[in-house]
Amino acid sequence: MTPPTFTPPVTDADVTVLANGIDAPALWPGLPIRPVKGEILRLRWRKGCMPVPQRVIRARVHGRQVYLVPRADGVVAGATQYEHGRDTAPAVTGVRDILDDACAVMPALGEYELAECAAGLRPMTPDGLPIVGWLDDRTLAATGHGRNGFLLAPWTAQRISDLLAGDVKEKVALC
């Protein structure tokens, strides 16, 4: 598929990098990015409760992935992932699933304080792989990382740096 012609809003730039997540298709129509909702919880340790774990815990409960990330004051538990348009409100079902799964892995979390429920939208591609590369001679894309955005940030930064330095020139093949 040949990508559409794109005129960057900043015309004096030599190269434009599209890194605007779920809204990338607004700047490059046809880019196969869709929003996927994700929820996480922050659980605060309370006096008398079992201590915060010392390491990240990853598990699978009832076919769902759950992770527990230790923080100074408690644990971040996550995460859901499902198609729900552009809704960014935490849903009771998502919160319940995370709590059930987290407590199945570490039952003592049931006594922690539920400090925060948060939801956001992740840019996802049809094949689940990020789009990082040239779209045309003046436009790079760095989007579609899904739930692994923070994890892949160092790789993406290095890849974009290499592309800008001219070390790699192949164009992204869009489905």
Question: What feature does the model see in each segment?
Answer:
Residues 1-2, 15, 39:
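Generic beta-strand structural signal
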Residues 1-10:
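A conserved short coil-to-beta-strand element within the FAD-binding core of flavoproteins
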